């Protein structure tokens, strides 16, 4: 029995029990790599959840984009409501890295916008890893970037116990040293205030207030308070307050780092002057000396991450410490959609280094700036204790690492079979497709169409719109939240046909889609390779009448392989259904509002997102309403403070609506 408590309204069925047992057995026999080869819709996430429960180790679940990470986090939180399921993605809403373009002599300064809410979730993840073992962190690939040293972060934490003697002024200095700011007027995340013998802190990793009552220098009580109502939520005997930033540099380490930076600067200036690069030398000297002054005076400077090697005391070329270093030695890695995620891990380092080299060569940065980087692929895998690759189409590298430890999961709990596949010629393909679409629309079903080019997708969208089809086009410029909303609208029948290029493959859960059409299926290449075709065909694998039409004049090797693999899986599924008397059932998966789903991860929404939630009040669960009322009250007070009385009145009315809904339920 482990600390993980899996809660699900169903038991493992089909080949899930065998898959769970095989994976657990492989992990317990200390095999480093294993693969779960699971067809679309077979419940791979549930299988992984069951494995985590049985193994009982802290787990990192790696997803290849933020949208998929959010989806996985929501699912795992439903499976493990009593355990810590954390969300760790890049905290930038906007990020323009520092760069230099020699051809036009253009220097682009780094500019970024940090999402405070996501920063809180990142801190919550690292705090959970220090305090408990029943932790699952769902992360994007950005987790392989440097994150500061876990040992220093833990060492800098301030431990407080009821009855402990702690000089108040010393405690305030300690809070400032770990990047907390004093603000006696407004108490928000990363701030504290002192009123008489009462110290209130909002830690970096949550939005509750920690209230510490002193009697002289003795800690009399420690309590968690609701930030809005002041209600006591929990009484504590002890607490650890972790730093407000992950990058923590002790004062003595900072002095050594500044000396090392100065030494490197002197050596680099000699190199540049010998090479006749006087402009570059002058530029580097001026910039670095200014940064050194800032570091010595305030312990911080813009672009401080470029000095991370010196600040951390690493040797040249040594890998930075990142999220995986916060895990204990026996941690488990799960790589979701591994055929996409693994190549992403490989590509992160090379892209970063090419940009840094230009900055270093032209005197914008010291050579040590190159060590502020993501992990190389081999460095990342060296840190991995044990790993499960999860994919319907695992890559060759994953299969090679797993050797014969490949666990197939082909049977769907619903009995739904893999789609039927039809190959049709390209001549008259659009008119043929139009007929298929009309047939599906009559049955209130949805259609996905994938094209090879953006231009073709646009033209096809226009053509279908002119013929009265409700169609949308999904392209790469659409942001993550908008993308989820478009998919949401497709599921709810706002439109019937979705067209895209490379956006219709992994991670789309669309039970309403009964037809996938692949245009130019015979054009060999990345988008029409075997794995891509299987993934795209799989988008119709959740519907009992799922079909895929491949339009092409030739049968390529990729098409043949994809068709044969789908037929093989379909035959296994049919045989299982006949043997057990299973009649395929449609997947009844309630479409959940994307903003409400985001609310499950991020308990704080901006004003625009709050408005979208309020427009869907009927969809809110009773558990979500109190949280939403608190957020609306905070927005109402903020609006009133800014003299925006119309907005404040609107929030007041929304709060009344929500309270009425709660009261009606009680009655």
Swiss-Prot record:
SS bond list: none
Positions of the UVR domain: 626-661
Source domain of life: Bacteria
Keyword entries, A-Z: ATP-binding, Cytoplasm, DNA damage, DNA excision, DNA repair, Excision nuclease, Helicase, Hydrolase, Nucleotide-binding, SOS response
PROSITE patterns reported in the protein's UniProt record: HELICASE_ATP_BIND_1, HELICASE_CTER, UVR
Transmembrane segments: none
Protein location: Cytoplasm
Entry keyword annotation includes ATP-binding: yes
Chain positions recorded as ATP binding sites: 38-45
Motif Beta-hairpin: positions: 91-114
UniProt xrefs under Pfam families: Helicase_C (PF00271), ResIII (PF04851), UVR (PF02151), UvrB (PF12344), UvrB_inter (PF17757)
InterPro entries found in the cross-reference section: Helicase/UvrB_N, Helicase_ATP-bd, Helicase_C-like, P-loop_NTPase, UVR_dom, UVR_dom_sf, UvrB, UvrB_inter
GO cellular component, one term: cytoplasm
Positions of the Helicase C-terminal domain: 429-595
Chief localisation class: cytoplasm
GO terms for MF: ATP binding; ATP hydrolysis activity; DNA binding; excinuclease ABC activity; helicase activity
Residue span(s) of domain Helicase ATP-binding: 25-180
Gene Ontology biological process terms in this record: nucleotide-excision repair; SOS response
Job of this protein: The UvrABC repair system catalyzes the recognition and processing of DNA lesions. A damage recognition complex composed of 2 UvrA and 2 UvrB subunits scans DNA for abnormalities. Upon binding of the UvrA(2)B(2) complex to a putative damaged site, the DNA wraps around one UvrB monomer. DNA wrap is dependent on ATP binding by UvrB and probably causes local melting of the DNA helix, facilitating insertion of UvrB beta-hairpin between the DNA strands. Then UvrB probes one DNA strand for the presence of a lesion.
Family: Belongs to the UvrB family.
UniProt subunit comment: Forms a heterotetramer with UvrA during the search for lesions. Interacts with UvrC in an incision complex.
Domain notes: The beta-hairpin motif is involved in DNA binding.
Protein name: UvrABC system protein B
Source species of the chain: Microcystis aeruginosa (strain NIES-843 / IAM M-2473)
Gene label: uvrB
